[in-house]
Amino acid sequence: MEDIQKNHEAQRGLQNRHIQLIAIAGTIGTGLFLGAGKTIQMTGPSVIFAYILIGIAMFFFLRTIGEMLYNDPSQHSFLNFVTKYSGIRTGYFTQWSYWLVIVFVCISELTAIGTYIQFWLPHLPLWLIEIVMLALLFGLNTLNSRFFGETEFWFAMIKVAAILGMIVTAIILVASNFHYTTVLSGKTVNDTASLNNIFDGFQLFPHGAWNFVGALQMVMFAFTSMEFIGMTAAETVNPKKSLPKAINQIPVRILLFYVGALLAIMAIFNWHYIPADKSPFVIVFQLIGIKWAAALINFVVLTSAASALNSSLFSATRNMYSLAKQHDKGRLTAFTKLSKAGIPINALYMATALSLLAPVLTLIPQIKNAFNFAASCTTNLFLVVYFITLYTYWQYRKSDDYNPNGFLTPKPTIAVPFIAIIFAIVFASLFFNADTFYPALGAIVWTLIFGLYSHFKKI
């Protein structure tokens, strides 16, 4: 009987060390390596407060997910709880919306991977690179989830090594009172690595409070993959041990990897001169004589994008599997099929096939603008899903399943409203920026139209 059950459930192949590194990989995105200069220019040293504020909100948000998963780790996704506690129609809307978001992430990350590889192989067709990389990651995802965990483990280690290298470099330069002459933002700068670069003339909002809110947007969307750890519970060997540990270490990781890296950059360079359009990591490593710094950081962001695509394929596959088991059972039964390795194989085929839209976009650039707009709209759906998840958590607390002795969210009556307010501020601010207004409006239109469809659909 046990063997039969195993053949009908995704297999538990993820070890504790995999979960810890998956949590790190979900915390660190390409935005830190490529976009740190832009966020620093928007609000100066107070950018660290933006990361801390959003980091606190995301930590408590993950604690709400962790509390539900700890109580019932058999669920294949944290989204399953939406159906369980907020109703089947809300669950239908949320899971389909989240699946759509993840598919768009797959396409976007595959395109990014191709661009990064062309840094070294500029004459190789982008569409060919995309197909080869997708085939490789598809192959990895057909193996036992333990292999997925190993891949993410080493992807995360590369990112961690780059950040720690930056922090150690800053400590050495500051401690040695390192003086340098370099060109930043078109200006010749003579300066010394010092903490004074951060604290002298400090202003909380040097470019106004609105730019600080704009930085909150960028930080929020840099953190949107952190909930991925909630997709791994059903395939973790000992979720009641590993999940709490991984989630509780998130604040330390944010302080070390984000705040630590940003402080390191701003200690070396006066923030006024840090260019918004160039990676500060490249500038720092070039400063200490690493001539191939650009290639090094390109390798890091390549592994980061590959990690994001790998995780997104994993997530889209499990989400479709969960959808097929909970909703539309007649039409989606094929997606409940598991391979011998315990992988929802047909769901993986579907996610991979849709990811092939990336090389199609490369070959037919005329439709790329429409895709970019749709991708921007779906990115904002992350926040819609987060709001629904918060509501679901509150419904769980009122249900008979509530476990007062579990992995409890600290001060939930304070934490949940705080999270909701931060998320609401970020979402509302999207309507006051020309670049984000229409994508935010598109997310609302999707929510209204598909929400009504989900409400009236026979399920």
Curated annotation (Swiss-Prot):
The chain crosses the membrane at residues 19-39, 42-62, 97-117, 119-139, 153-173, 212-232, 254-274, 281-301, 341-361, 370-390, 412-432, 436-456. InterPro entries: AA-permease/SLC12A_dom (IPR004841). Keywords: Amino-acid transport, Cell membrane, Membrane, Transmembrane, Transmembrane helix, Transport. It is a multi-pass membrane protein. GO terms for cellular component: plasma membrane. Its main location: membrane. One of its GO terms (biological process) is transmembrane transport. The keyword Zinc does not apply. It is found in: Cell membrane. Belongs to the amino acid-polyamine-organocation (APC) superfamily. Amino acid transporter (AAT) (TC 2.A.3.1) family. Transports L-serine, L-threonine and L-cysteine with high affinity. Stereoselective, with a strong preference for L-serine. Is the main L-serine transporter and is responsible for optimal growth in media containing free amino acids as the sole source of amino acids. Is also the main transporter for L-threonine. This is Serine permease SerP1. It comes from Lactococcus lactis subsp. cremoris (strain MG1363).
